[in-house]
Amino acid sequence: VDEEQGVKPLEVVAAVIRDAQGRVLVAQRPIDKHQGGKWEFPGGKVEQGESRRSALGRELNEELGIEISSSKRLISIYHEYEDKSIYLDVYEVNHWGGEPSGCEGQPVKWVEVDELKTLDFPDANAPIIDAVCLPKLLKYLKPVATDGAFREQVNQSLEDGHKLLFHNYEEQPISHEQLNWLLDTAAEKKAEVVFQSPPPLVRNDYGIHLNHEALVKAHEKPAAQRVSASCYNPGELFKAQRLGVDFIILEPVLMNLFSTGHEALGWPMFQSLAARVNIPVYASGGVSEKDLELAREYGAQGIASTSLS
C-alpha cells in the first residue's frame, strides 16, 4: 500500500515511559523528518506482519537501547495530517531494562507531567498528553445527608489519593460555602473537581460535566478548567468530540440503566465505541476498581465509580 497517497493509515506505536519519580521521557524528531524538530513520545512504524506490542519493543530498543518488560494500553488515536493519516496506538511503560539514551542521535529528556503541555508536539499527540495528565480513577461523590458527612467523604477521598472528583449538583445541591471549601480542599491536594449542573461561580478552577441533555443542547465547549461529557451511543461520542471535551464517561458498561432505558454495553462494545474518538474515555456503570486493568485493555482511560477505595 502506498502510504504517501493516503490509501491506508500509517500504523504507529508510541510509548509513555515513566521513571520512578513520575517523569516522562520525550524525544525530539529529526529536522528532516515529518513534523521535524517537534517533541514526541518514542516509538515508530509497525512493520508488516508485526504485532503492535512487538513493534513497540523493537522501536524502543532501536531508539533508546532499552528492553521493556511490560506495557499497558493508554489510548488509540486516528489523525489526519495534510500529507498523511496515522493510526497511533499508545502504551504506558513503567518497567524496562537499560538506561534510555538517544541511540539514533536524537535529543531525549525527562520532563515533569505538567511540563508536557508547554512543549511543541505534533497535533496528533494532544490526546496523549490529556491521557497522561488524567488519573486512572474518577471518584463519584455520593449524596449524603449532612454537611459533616459531605466533608468526611471529600476528605477521605482525597486522603485515599483520588485526584479527580465528580459532584452532581442536581443530585445534591450544596451551599456556596461548601462548594468553595470543596474546591479549596481539593486544590490543597492537587486534585480537580468536576461538577454536573453547578451554579454560577466567580472562580474558574473547576470542571463542568455535560450530562445527556446538556450535551445535546451544547453548541460550544463551556468555559471551564476541564469539560467532560456522558455518552451512551456513537452520535453522542462524536458530538462530544466536536465540542472538544477533555474526557468522556461512556456508560453503562456492566449494568442496565433502567432509569434511562440503556442496556449494558459489555466490554467488546465499549471498546468498539471508545475507539471511535480521539479522547480519553472512562468506563462507568456497574464497574469498580477491580475492573481497572480489564477496562484499560479494552481501551479505557480508567474507571468512573462510587466504588473506589
Predicted features along the sequence, with ranges:
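Conserved N-terminal beta-strand and adjoining loop/helix that marks the start
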Residues: D2-V24, S76
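Glycine/Thr-rich beta-alpha phosphate-binding loop at enzyme active sites
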Residues: N204-A214, R226-A275
